[in-house]
Regions:
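Helix-loop-helix junctions within the multi-pass membrane cores of secondary transporters/permeases
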Residues: 95-189, 193
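Hydrophobic, membrane-inserted alpha-helices
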Residues: 11-15, 32-38, 56-60, 78-82, ...
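Hydrophobic, small-residue-rich transmembrane alpha-helices and their short perimembrane loops
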Residues: 54-123
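Transmembrane helix interruption/hinge and helix-loop junction motifs
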Residues: 42-49, 88-93, 202-204, 217-224
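C-terminal transmembrane helix-loop-helix hairpin of multi-pass membrane proteins
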Residues: 6-9, 171-259
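Intrinsically disordered, low-complexity non-transmembrane regions of multi-pass membrane transporters
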Residues: 1, 118-137, 240-259
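Hydrophobic transmembrane alpha-helices
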Residues: 1-71
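Alpha-helical transmembrane segments and their membrane-interface exit regions
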Residues: 36-39, 57-64, 102-110, 215-218, ...
Length: 259
């Protein structure tokens, strides 16, 4: 599949908007489960976009940024990985193995960009001391423009100039290597879940985890059915723990002379 200039620009604009949302809006538009289908719509393959976005969401679900420890960049990883899956026709698991190296490289660039921007803070301090609100606004808008432009270029350049070579590269690579990428991509969602469980797991959650494992591994229930049952359990637990409304105490009556 060939990607037109218009499609590459549209994907770059999508990365621009998602990059600003990740650090400023936080409407969760930057998550793979949202970006994947949007990439699929732009490239005309919504089905693959949904599958790849869902697979990548499992990978990044447990990768939360903690201070200076930043996970691979979720936006470029999703856009490049989903585009790779659509243009080459590989399975989403293989696309995960391709997306993560791009995501790691871009996150290093983001860290460098933020380090450069930190040099402007001393100037912002002087503006704040002089009550120069317009100057601070200009600095903020400039930073947003620089961040969005970086995301645009990181999405546009590899997609527009590299998409036509991606299919050729896949055809040349040995089948064992492709299978290895698929295995690595299949392991990464499990790693994401493991990291998420390490963060939120408590002893009281272990029985629910066992129930979900039995339902999925032994009873072969679909994920949607397990999610609906988990939602019902969560609602039951919430309603049981919610305090009942207390009745107002009846006013005490005072009696005089024994009446």
């Amino acid at each position: 599949m060939e990607i037109s200039l218009f499609q590459a620009i549209a994907l770059g604009i999508l990365a621009f908007i998602a990059g600003l949302d990740m650090f400023n809006g936080l409407t969760h538009m930057h998550r793979p489960v949202v970006l994947g289908p949007l990439v699929g719509l732009i490239l005309g393959d919504l089905h693959t976009g949904i599958l790849t976005g869902g697979t990548l969401e499992l990978v990044w679900m447990g990768l939360a940024p903690l201070a200076g420890a930043q996970p691979p960049n979720v936006i470029i990883g999703t856009i490049v990985g989903t585009t790779f899956a659509i243009t080459t026709g590989v399975k989403p698991d293989v696309a995960v193995g391709v997306a993560v190296p791009f995501a790691v490289a871009v996150q290093m660039g983001i860290t460098f960009l933020f380090s450069v921007m930190s040099g402007v803070m001393s100037r912002c301090d002087r503006m704040a001391a002089n009550a120069d609100t317009r100057g601070i606004e200009r600095v903020n808008y400039l930073a947003l423009l620089a961040l969005g432009t970086f995301y645009f270029l990181c999405a546009f350049l590899p997609i527009y100039f590299g998409a036509e070579h991606a299919k050729t590269a896949i055809d040349v690579l040995p089948e064992r290597l492709i299978d290895g990428l698929g295995v690595a991509g299949g392991i990464m969602p499990a790693i994401g879940f493991a990291v998420l469980l390490k963060i939120m797991m408590k002893n009281v959650y272990i029985p629910y985890f066992i129930i979900g494992f039995v339902a999925g591994a032994w009873l072969k229930l679909p994920v949607l059915a397990i999610a609906a049952a988990a939602l019902a359990m969560a609602l039951i637990d919430l309603l049981r723990k919610s305090p009942e409304p207390t009745q107002p105490a009846a006013p005490k009556e005072e009696f005089e002379d024994g009446i």
